[in-house]
């Protein structure tokens, strides 16, 4: 739709919050789509996008699920799960710390990672830009740009209004050789099984 005076509604007539993404796409939370099924949504004239419920203040981001505080290097210094009041990171640890490791394989360039790879490393803390690239009723996106030697690392932290999760999307323009990159998220979870990607 060319004009932004429209609404998205589901088959039951419920109005669904929406917003434009940083790259101009229409974004909304498709609630209630059955597994292996579908649900129809329609664009109708009139109405508004909805209100932003994700708060950004200084280096603190808050929605109804989490309170997140960033440190001076834009690493996550504190992530509190509001429903339980529990800190996700272990005491004294930060989430999202990026490391560059010396990568000197014996035989093969790709995936020949030796057990001692973590003995020589550099923390990547050179933040060159922090921008709020999206702020709307569906999500808020904080983009952090880091520099390392000749490379650039863009991290987009995505905080949703109605989803109990935080996504971190990486875009890396990597120009280095024999250097391994790692993002560290030490979480304080005591479980015999975990599902993650």
Language model features with spans:
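Catalytic and substrate-binding regions of extracellular carbohydrate-active enzymes
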Residues: 1-172, 183
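Extended, low-complexity, turn-rich repeat/linker tracts enriched in Gly/Pro/Ser/Thr and Asp/Glu
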Residues: 174-179
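Polysaccharide-binding surfaces and accessory modules of carbohydrate-active proteins
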Residues: 185-197
């Amino acid at each position: 739709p060319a004009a932004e005076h429209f609404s998205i509604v589901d088959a039951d007539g419920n109005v669904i919050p929406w917003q434009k993404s940083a790259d101009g796409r229409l974004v909304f939370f498709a609630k209630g789509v059955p597994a292996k099924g579908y649900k129809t949504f329609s664009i109708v004239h009139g109405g508004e996008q909805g209100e932003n419920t994700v708060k950004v203040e200084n280096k603190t981001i808050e929605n109804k699920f989490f309170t997140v505080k960033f440190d001076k290097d834009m690493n996550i210094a504190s992530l509190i799960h509001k429903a339980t009041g529990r800190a996700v990171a272990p005491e004294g640890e930060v989430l999202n710390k990026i490391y560059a490791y010396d990568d000197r394989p014996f035989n093969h360039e790709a995936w020949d990672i030796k057990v001692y790879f973590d003995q020589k490393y550099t923390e990547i803390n050179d933040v060159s830009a922090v921008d709020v690239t999206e702020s709307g009723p569906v999500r808020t996106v904080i983009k952090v740009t880091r520099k390392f030697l000749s490379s650039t690392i863009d991290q987009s932290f995505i905080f949703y209004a109605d989803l109990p999760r935080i996504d971190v999307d990486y875009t890396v323009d990597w120009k280095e050789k024999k250097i391994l990159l790692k993002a560290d998220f030490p979480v304080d979870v005591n479980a015999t099984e975990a599902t993650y990607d």
